[in-house]
Amino acid sequence: MPTTQAVPTTTEPLWAKVIDHTSCIGCHACTTACKSENEVPLSVTRTYVKYVDVGHWPEARRSFQVTRCNQCEDAPCVAACPTAAMYRRPDGIVDFDKSICIGCKACIAACPYDAIFINPEDNSAEKCNFCAHRLDVGLEPACVVVCPTQALMVGDMNDPLSQVSQVINRDAVTVRKPEKGTRPKVFYKGADQVTLDPLAARRPDGGLYMWSEQGDVSHQVPSGHPGQWNNSAAAVLSYDIPHRAPWDFRVSLYTFTKSISAGAYLVPLILAMTGMIPWTSTAWTLIGPIVAMVFLG
């Protein structure tokens, strides 16, 4: 009697990360490993650790939060990018293509997690991408490899036997800003709400952090709220990185000048097409292109 055999099928992995705050010791090994692996310049980071001191002496504790791209299923940065430089791979990783990025910062403004930055060396957008180049060849991300307490886990959510799937299904985990509807794929275990919510902890007096000072706060968004605003006097940021507002006058100037450039070229073209000026007019053949090129530059 003939028998049939089930043909094995391969399922595309769905990569996700679990950050165990009950194990994190705030050592910054993940930050330095990420910088080394991805050649991230000074002054910018793909991942960083934030410290928040909670409570009053003698009952005080320090909470840590590892911050990075949340690999959203419905990624606002992908929707905002005008050149498709930000894109979501079939395996769930939100990746970027530096070769077509124009540095417009639309992705930075769209991201609700403060996870994207402009690389000062090539003026293109970067962020954590789970070390996709390592996952593609069967290696773990650099941060996962170096974490001394194994607080970072990356795995396939489509595999019920993966450590990430088991932790998500077994333990109480949360995501950042679920109200945004982005369906992030970075899950936090044992996280203190004062670290996940940028409005829950006040800045230290004078902007003086553990190891650094953040400059003129009038040009920064230190933790997502005005410098003196605070809804929890018992929660104080003790270490954070500068968070500059993604868009300033340069974006408005960029939009304004490029609009003039487009108009200077299109208006003479429309006038020529409608017969209001001859095709040989200097407004179309000379003045329009010159003005367009000046404002385009």
Question: What function would you assign to each model-found segment?
Answer:
Residues 217-297:
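Hydrophobic cores of alpha-helical transmembrane segments in multi-pass integral membrane proteins
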Residues 1-247:
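Non-ligating segments of multi-cofactor redox enzymes
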